[in-house]
Amino acid sequence: MSDHGQASEASMGPHPDMEAHAGRGEHAGPGEHAHRGEPPAPEACPEPGRYVIAPRRVSFDWENTPLHWIPGEPTATHVINVLHLLLPAGERWFVKVFKEALPLVDDPGLLKDVKGFMGQEATHSVQHSHVLDHLAAQRLDTTAYTRHVDFLFEKLLGEEPPLGVPVPAREWLRFRLSLIAAIEQFTAVLGDWVLGADALDRAGSDAVMLDLLRWHGAEEVEHRAVAFDMYQHCGGEGLPRYARRIEGMAVVTPVLLWLWVWGASYLMRHDPALLRRGPGRPRYSLREHNRAVARGLLPTWGELGSAIPRYFRRSYHPSQEGSLRRAAEYLAASPAARAAAGAIGRAAMT
C-alpha cells in the first residue's frame, strides 16, 4: 500500500457551484494594462468563496490490479497506460518550470493557485511512478521508453536551451510556459472525459486504476486554468504573447501524438501476456484503437481534436473546459482520497 501526497486536503468555498473558475484569462501581465482589441478577462471568483487548489493525500493498493485492467481490451488498456509513461517526468518538469517562473508572479491569487498546482502535479508524478513499478512487477519493463521521456524533459526542455541555442532566458521560459499551458488543455479534456466514461465501468475495469485516473482527471479539471493563467501573466503582452501561445500548441500537438502512438506501440510489443499468445509480435493497431473508441473506452478523435481550435481563439479561457462541479463531487468521494484521510485520522487518534 502506498500513501503519498504533499499537503493537506483541498478546501473549497461555501458552495461548489463553481463553473466560472477563478481564471484570469486574457489579463495583462505584471504591471500591464489590457491591450486594445483583446477581450476582457473573465472575472475571478471573489473571496472568500474562491475555490482553493491544493494537493490531496491519496492511497492506492496495486496488489490486485491485473496487467490488462480493462478485461479483454489490451489496446484500450495500453493507450491509457501511456499516461503512466509520460506523467512522472512530465509533471516533475511542470513543477521545475513553474519554480523558475515564480519570481515573475506578482498576483497573490495566482501565486496561491500556482503553488497548489505544483503540489498537485508533484503528487500525480509520484502516483503514476508507482504504476510503472507495478507494471515492472508484472514483467512489463518500461525503462527503455521512459529514459527517452526523461531526456526530452530534462535535457531538451531543461533550464537552458539545448545545444547552446542563443535564446534569451526570459523567452526560453515563456516558450516552456506556453508548452505547459497547451498540454494542460489536453489534460483538462481527458480529465473531464474519464470522469464521464461510464463504458469503463461497464467493461469491468479495475476499480483502483479507475480511481487513480478519475482522481487525477478531477484535479486536472480543478486546476484547468492555472497553467494558462500563469502563461498569460508571465508571457509578455499583446500579439507576441498570443502568437507564442499558438506556437506552444502547434509544437505540443504533433509531439504528444507521436509520443502516445510510440508509447502504446511499445507497451503492446513488450506485453508479456500478449507475447505468450503465440507467434508474431503484438502491435498497436489503429483499427483496434477505433473499435475501443466506438465502445466508449477511449475518447473520440473529435473530442481531442476540437480542443485545438478552441484554444486558438483569442478570447479563449480554460474555465470553459469540463465541469468543476463534477470534479469536486468525485474528489469528495474518491476511495483513494477517503482511505488516506481515514488513515490520517486513525493515526491522529493513536
Task: Please state what every model-predicted region is.
Residues 2-8, 13-15, 21, 33-350:
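Non-heme di-metal
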